[in-house]
Amino acid sequence: MTKLSTVDPNASVLNPQRFIQRERENCSIDIDQVNTFLESDPRSRDLTHLIVDQLVNDPIIKADSATYDQTKLTQREVTVKKIARMALYMEQDIKTVRKHFRDTDLLKSLQDFGDTTTPPLTNKDLAIFDKRLSLVANMDPQLSTRIGVHLGLFGNCIKGNGTDEQIKYWLQTRGAILIKGIYGCFAMTELGHGSNVAQLQTTATYDQESDTFIINTPDLAATKWWIGGAAHSATHTACYARLLVNGKDYGVKTFVVPLRDPSSLQLMPGIAIGDIGAKMGRDGIDNGWIQFRNVVIPREFMLSRFTKVHRNPGATPTVEVDPQLDQISGYSALLSGRVNMVMDSFRFGSKFATIATRYAVGRQQFADKPGQPEKQLIDYPLHQYRVLPQIVIPYIISPAAFSLLNFYYSTLDELYAASSKNDKRALVVVSQKLKNLFIDSASLKATNTWLVAQLIDELRQTCGGHGYSGYNAFGKGYNDWVVQCTWEGDNNILSLTSAKSILKKFVDSATKGKYNKELDKRSFRYLDPQFIRKVFTSSSENKLDDLYDYTNIWAVALLKLLRHIAKQVDSTKDLDGASKLLVLVSKFHALYVMLNTYYEKLNSPTDSYVTCPKTKEQLWNVYKLFSLYFIDKHAGEFQQFKILSPDQISQVVQPRLLKLLPEIRKECISLTDSFKWPDGMLNAPIGYYDGDIYHNYFNEVVKNNPVEKDGAGIPPYHELLANMLTRGDEFARLGGANNAEILSKLTK
């Protein structure tokens, strides 16, 4: 890094890098083993390192401090350049996968999608690029979103709702899967409706004579709103609209609607589009609004895997709907984004944990006694309580994020295989898996995006005034992040819907003994009828003696909370009246799943990849601290529902929590170094690896705000300032008195 300061770093009284270096010298854990644990396995770890190295060194993709000063227009232009670069990476990533997994000529398949001898692109083909997209989200969320809307929303909507022929046409023949030919957006949300998809108002009316659909926006509230990519770039959209045939409303279905000519980007007839304007963050995304006025599309542009319209020339057109398949469509539509947001939570959380921890170790404030050195922030007990639990949050998220991602891909592969073959028996099984996947993805997405939003802001505050600087990532990071709490399912709505499904499962298990051990063992072991009976018949108090107790206590908490809600709803017949507690069920379920997945991975002799005893001990401390921290946060509920007694909270939970903090503090630098984020990924000078906080920070500020001979330079509004400061007495009268008279009164 070019040093722009004239100050000799060796002459500084404050030398924060020496504290960082001392922490690393005293490290007792194997950060390579921890990193492998966090990245799931050695192969995933190596791929992550390779991609991260490529991203931070790519002259177009890389981020630097200049990003924080860019205007909205500049951000959008830069983002498009980065999309073009990522498209090239995509082709290379697919070639790499096929070289290892498929004996086919990739170049031929890229050029000739009509060749039926060439296998279509699959999730496996996109595996490397999907990881690349996940990692670039940590550096540039708006870039990943721009591509994610096209591939993840537009593309997955077609894959989830289209027939095999439609999938091949739109994604391969038209080139969408390779970000070629067409560029898609996802028109679900309307000005008047978001979460309540069933009440969307845009219409798609079938015209039998022309064998087309006519798309219309019936009123202002039906305007498609918040549509990423719509304002300037999308050529097509996956439009959610009400299917109207012969005057009958068949509910909301999906249609591919052309918006612009791909060659000229001119709007198609009947399309009106605008930019929705200023947002909290992610200005590189051209969010827009769309209105349709008698827009005509062919019947074949309706995605027809689950619902088909038959023209029946000379007779009345008919609509074929398979209720089971239509239900599956409802579960699969937005799963990809929710699943990926759990992984985003791990990566984004680890980024800001790294920045704040390095600052806390390097920063000094106040001394115990005059003449003594100032203490490091991290050595204050309160600061430890504020920072260290935030470090362990991404640790506990990681195994659950990878597990959920694997569950998503395997379930979707089963769905596509079963629906393509119209295998009804297989569809019954996969529909149950999809329901469980919906519960887990909704609960984990909501809980973890909330956790990371709180993490970013709390850690920003722990960095004091420097955390407020735009150059230290927290401001943009928070503004870019918090949309995750709203889009692709508002967190409260997702929490309620997942909790209602969990409540139904609980009632079925507790009253009817209904429990599918094979399907539910992954996330719902606490709903096993035998475990339910044990919890409610045992007279012994819950303890935290064994390692698994730190997970099991959340299973007990869930059951007691669910029983309370079930009794309340049975008495009041008012499920909405239990909404506050239902949101808590979703949070507790997420915490249970995360702790259970972490426990199983670390406890596995083959899957943890941790062989160093001291390293494993510290990772168990991470696990215990997470559980204790959130028990303490929910101490009121744990006492209210008699999960733990007040004495257990005050004499066991809280003392253990406080005792663990100094243990985690000893390894706080090594624990955050284990994430292995290079400076280019952090883009926050107070968190750079070398720990030279003040020089790094000062240099980035001066680089982006060059010092002139007149200091910061004469401002363009200097005349306004000068006129104010040099105004005559006639501008400064107070009650008829001049300045001299006022001054004489004040000095008497």
From Swiss-Prot:
GO molecular function terms noted in the UniProt entry: acyl-CoA oxidase activity; FAD binding; fatty acid binding
Enzyme class at the top of the EC tree: oxidoreductase
GO CC annotation: peroxisomal matrix
Tagged with keyword Oxidoreductase: yes
Pathway: Lipid metabolism; peroxisomal fatty acid beta-oxidation
Cofactor needs: FAD
Gene Ontology annotations of biological process type: fatty acid beta-oxidation using acyl-CoA oxidase; lipid homeostasis
Entry's localization field: Peroxisome
Superkingdom, taxonomy of origin: Eukaryota
Annotated signal peptide: none
Major subcellular location class: other
Annotated EC: 1.3.3.6
Annotated InterPro entries: ACOX_C_alpha1 (IPR055060), Acyl-CoA_ox_N (IPR029320), Acyl-CoA_Oxase/DH_mid-dom (IPR006091), Acyl-CoA_Oxase/DH_mid-dom_sf (IPR046373), Acyl-CoA_oxidase (IPR012258), Acyl-CoA_oxidase_C (IPR002655), AcylCo_DH-like_C (IPR036250), AcylCoA_DH/ox_N_sf (IPR037069)
Catalytic activity: a 2,3-saturated acyl-CoA + O2 = a (2E)-enoyl-CoA + H2O2
The keyword Cytoplasm is assigned to this record: no
Record key words, sorted: FAD, Fatty acid metabolism, Flavoprotein, Lipid metabolism, Oxidoreductase, Peroxisome
Pfam families noted in UniProt: ACOX, ACOX_C_alpha1, Acyl-CoA_dh_M, Acyl-CoA_ox_N
PANTHER family reported in the protein's UniProt record: ACYL-COENZYME A OXIDASE-LIKE PROTEIN, ELECTRON TRANSPORT OXIDOREDUCTASE
Family: Belongs to the acyl-CoA oxidase family.
UniProt name for this protein: Acyl-coenzyme A oxidase
Organism (species): Candida glabrata (strain ATCC 2001 / BCRC 20586 / JCM 3761 / NBRC 0622 / NRRL Y-65 / CBS 138)
